[in-house]
From Swiss-Prot:
This is one of the proteins that bind and probably mediate the attachment of the 5S RNA into the large ribosomal subunit, where it forms part of the central protuberance. HAMAP family: Ribosomal_uL18_B (MF_01337_B). This is Large ribosomal subunit protein uL18. Keywords: Ribonucleoprotein, Ribosomal protein, RNA-binding, rRNA-binding. The gene is rplR. Disulfide bonds: none annotated.
């Protein structure tokens, strides 16, 4: 089993557990160049989105593939989710380790008022 397959297996297992809870989830995906975050409800509807691909976010950042970019995305997605009336979510790290950019995004979302 390669690295990607292992990550996807972990992600699937975590998603099934979150689905059983029936709560909104904050989904994170990272690539070497960008980071993406979405708040998705139990019916699989996307409620809020933020990523380093967005022009408004890109203009604020020097680089899109670092911890500072992840913090910016975390803050923005939390603000957009709270605007839509979502205050509590489950954190879906998509099988990525809770470290570096993933952890920075989560911490920034918490600081912006999202509870998980």
């Amino acid at each position: 089993m390669d690295k990607k397959t292992s990550r996807l297996r972990r992600a699937l297992r975590a998603r099934k557990k979150i689905q059983e809870l029936g709560v909104n989830r904050l989904v994170v995906h990272r690539t070497p160049r960008h980071i993406y975050a979405q708040v998705i409800n139990p019916e699989a509807q996307v409620l809020a989105v933020a990523s380093t691909v967005e022009k408004a976010v890109k203009e604020l950042l020097k680089s899109t593939g670092n911890v500072d970019a992840a913090k910016a995305v975390g803050k923005i997605v939390a603000e957009r989710a709270i605007e839509k009336g979502v205050a509590t979510v489950a954190f879906d790290r998509s099988g990525f380790k809770y470290h570096g950019r993933v952890a920075a995004l989560a911490d920034a979302a918490r600081e912006a008022g999202l509870k998980f």
